[in-house]
Structures are given as structure tokens and as C-alpha cells.
Curated annotation (Swiss-Prot):
Annotated protein name in UniProt: Urease subunit beta
Enzyme Commission identifier(s): 3.5.1.5
Gene, per the UniProt record: ureB
Subunit structure, as described in the record: Heterotrimer of UreA (gamma), UreB (beta) and UreC (alpha) subunits. Three heterotrimers associate to form the active enzyme.
One family name in Pfam for this protein: Urease_beta
Species in which this protein is naturally found: Synechococcus sp. (strain CC9311)
Keywords: Cytoplasm, Hydrolase
Catalytic reactions on record: urea + 2 H2O + H(+) = hydrogencarbonate + 2 NH4(+)
Family matches, as InterPro entries: Urease_beta-like (IPR002019), Urease_betasu_sf (IPR036461), Urease_subunit (IPR050069)
Length: 106
């Protein structure tokens, strides 16, 4: 067996499906601004930058369906579809732009 390396992660062989069996909402998003906008994987999408035009009511309680720690960048004039999945766990949204600051299901 090879020596352990601090911080090293050893993964089992094979594939892992992220967010399996989660309900997916697809929204069309347009960047109406003059600057790029980047949204991270766990940002409450409803509260994303105001230059992004999309159905904010449909995005309530949802985040991007992308790997943790990654983001999607919307260039000025971009118009694309994104997949969103619901927050899970306690379903509390605190911070971001301060629009919710509490439970989503209250």
C-alpha cells in the first residue's frame, strides 16, 4: 500500500450521480447587464443578481444543479437554460440578499 498523503482523497472506482432523484426545474436566464454575473452552486438562485432576468418565483428555494464549489457565469447578453434543484435539509435560507432569512416552508 502506498504511503498516505495529508489531505489526499481516495475514491472508489466507478461513477457517482450527483443529485439523483431530485426534482429539477429548468429556467431560461438572460443577463441584461453590461458585466458578467457568476452564480455559485449553493446560492439561493431567486436572490441572484438583479441583472439576471428569469422567473424568480419559480426559483424560490432552489439552487443550481451543478457540482458543489462550482459556478455558472452569465456573460452580458447571454440567454441560456439552467437546471435548479430544491434546497434540502432544514430548508432555511439565511443571508444572500436577505430576502428570506428563515425557513422556506413557513
Amino acid at each position: 500500500m502506498a504511503p498516505l498523503i495529508p489531505g489526499e482523497l481516495l475514491a472508489e472506482p466507478g461513477e457517482l450521480e450527483l443529485n439523483a432523484n431530485r426534482e429539477v426545474t429548468t429556467l431560461t436566464v438572460a443577463n441584461s447587464g453590461d458585466r458578467p454575473v457568476q452564480v455559485g452552486s449553493h446560492f439561493h438562485f431567486q436572490e441572484a443578481n438583479a441583472a439576471l432576468i428569469f422567473d424568480r418565483d419559480a426559483a424560490r428555494g432552489q439552487r443550481l444543479d451543478i457540482p458543489a464549489g462550482t459556478a455558472i457565469r452569465f456573460e452580458p447578453g447571454d440567454n441560456r437554460d439552467v437546471n435548479l434543484i430544491p434546497f434540502s435539509g432544514a430548508r432555511r435560507v439565511v443571508g444572500f440578499n436577505g430576502n428570506i432569512n428563515g425557513p422556506l416552508d413557513a
